[in-house]
A protein has these predicted regions:
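Short, well-ordered strand-loop elements centered on a beta-strand within folded domains, enriched
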Residues: 167-171, 199-209
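A short, polar/proline- and glycine-enriched secondary-structure boundary/capping micro-motif
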Residues: 46, 179-182, 212-219, 258-259, ...
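Short, surface-exposed charged micro-motifs
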Residues: 157-158, 191-193, 236, 245-246
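Surface-exposed, charged secondary-structure patches
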Residues: 3-8, 20-48, 52-69, 137-182, ...
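Short, solvent-exposed aromatic-acidic interface loops
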Residues: 85, 205-215
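Structural recognition of the beta-propeller blade-terminating site
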Residues: 27, 195, 258-260
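Core segments of small alpha/beta cavity-forming domains
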Residues: 3-23, 33, 64-149, 222-263, ...
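A short, surface-exposed beta-strand/turn
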Residues: 181-205
Length: 301
C-alpha cells in the first residue's frame, strides 16, 4: 500500500455484466473483518474495469491482510482474493521496475550484453531452455536460438517482502512458429530475488522455467517416442498393463496415446483449440492420474 493509500485494481470482464463492486479487508485467517466498502467510482472500457480502492488507516505496519474483491453479476457473486501489506521502505515498486526491465532486456539482442554484470560462474546446463539461472551462459539467459515473442504481457506477483530483499515472480506466454509452420506456445515463469540499495540493484537469484503447451500435431510422434517439446523431465504418466496405451499430463491437460492404433487424443483440457486464454491457461490447473485399464479407460482427478 502506497503513501496515498489508494490501491489500483483492474478486472477483465470477458463480456460479463457487473452490477455492483465491493471489497473487504480481513485478517489473514479471514476471521476478523477490518473494513468493508462499496466501490461507487470506477470506469469500464473495452472489457476492462479500472478502480482505485481507498485503504483505511486501520492496518498494522508490516502485517499481511486478506483483501476480498466482490463483483455482483445478476444473481451470481464473483470473488477475487489477494494479500495486502503496509510496509515502509520496502522498495517493491522499484524492484518490480527492475524485474520488468531485466525481462525486456533478455528479448533485446542489442542490449542483452548489459546483463553480464548479474551473471555468475557458468555451471548450468546450456543445452536446454527449460530451466535457466544466472549460472547459465548469457546467451542462454537471452533465449539462445529461440526467436520467440511474448504473447502476453508479463504479470508480476510479489511473493515476499523483507527488509533485505523482495521476491517477485513473472508469468507470461511466449510463442513462435515451429518447423512445421504451426504456432507453438510456452508458459514461462521467472523467479527474481532482488535487493534495492541507493546506488544499484542486486539480483540475488534468477530462475526461469519454460513449459510447452502440447498441441498434439502430426509430428508429435516419432518412432516409439512422444515428442513433448521443452518441458521438465518429471512427466506425470501411466501405462496400461500391456504397455499399449499411455496417458500423460502436460501443462494442465490430459492426453492418451494408443500405440497399436497410432492415435493421440486429448482427454481433458480447459483450453480451447485457438490461441491462449488467461482463464483457460490458469497455472493452478492440475490433473492426477489414478488408473488406466487395459481398454485404455482413464480414472483421474
Amino acid at each position: 500500500i502506497g503513501e496515498d493509500r489508494l490501491l489500483p485494481v483492474t478486472v477483465k470482464t470477458y463480456q460479463t455484466a457487473v452490477d455492483k463492486i465491493s471489497y473487504e479487508i480481513r485478517s489473514l485467517d479471514a476471521k476478523r473483518l477490518i473494513a468493508n466498502a462499496d466501490v461507487t467510482s470506477y470506469t469500464e472500457n473495452k472489457g476492462m474495469i479500472s478502480m482505485e480502492l481507498p485503504i483505511q488507516n486501520l492496518l498494522e505496519e508490516n502485517e499481511e491482510y486478506l483483501l476480498v474483491i466482490q463483483l455482483e453479476s445478476g444473481d451470481r457473486m464473483i470473488y477475487y482474493y489477494t494479500r495486502i501489506i503496509e510496509s515502509q521502505n520496502s522498495y517493491v515498486s522499484e524492484c518490480i521496475d527492475f524485474v520488468r526491465q531485466f525481462n525486456d532486456t533478455t528479448f533485446d539482442s542489442e542490449k542483452a550484453a548489459s546483463l553480464s554484470t548479474y551473471m555468475e560462474k557458468t555451471i548450468g546446463d546450456n543445452t536446454t531452455l527449460q530451466y535457466v539461472t544466472l549460472n547459465n551462459s548469457l546467451n542462454q539467459v537471452s533465449w539462445a536460438e529461440f526467436h520467440g515473442t511474448r504473447l502476453t504481457t508479463p504479470v508480476p506477483s510479489v511473493k515476499e517482502i523483507t527488509p533485505t530483499y523482495n521476491v517477485i515472480v513473472l508469468d507470461y506466454v511466449v510463442t513462435w512458429v515451429g518447423q512445421n509452420g504451426q504456432s507453438e506456445y510456452y508458459n514461462v515463469e521467472e523467479y527474481y530475488r532482488v535487493r534495492y540499495t541507493n546506488t544499484r540493484m542486486y539480483l540475488l537469484n534468477f530462475e526461469r522455467t519454460m513449459e510447452e503447451i502440447f498441441r498434439g500435431e502430426n509430428d508429435s510422434i516419432s518412432g516409439n517416442s512422444i515428442l513433448l517439446g521443452i518441458r521438465s523431465k518429471d512427466v506425470e504418466y501411466q501405462t496400461n498393463e500391456s504397455g499399449k496405451v499411455v496417458t500423460f499430463v502436460q501443462e494442465g491437460e490430459l492426453w492418451s496415446y494408443n500405440q497399436e492404433a497410432n492415435t493421440l487424443a486429448k482427454v481433458f483440457s480447459f483450453r480451447g483449440y485457438e490461441g491462449v486464454d488467461d482463464r483457460e491457461n490458469y497455472g493452478e490447473h492440475d490433473i492426477k492420474i489414478v488408473n488406466i485399464d487395459e481398454a485404455g479407460s482413464i480414472d483421474y482427478i
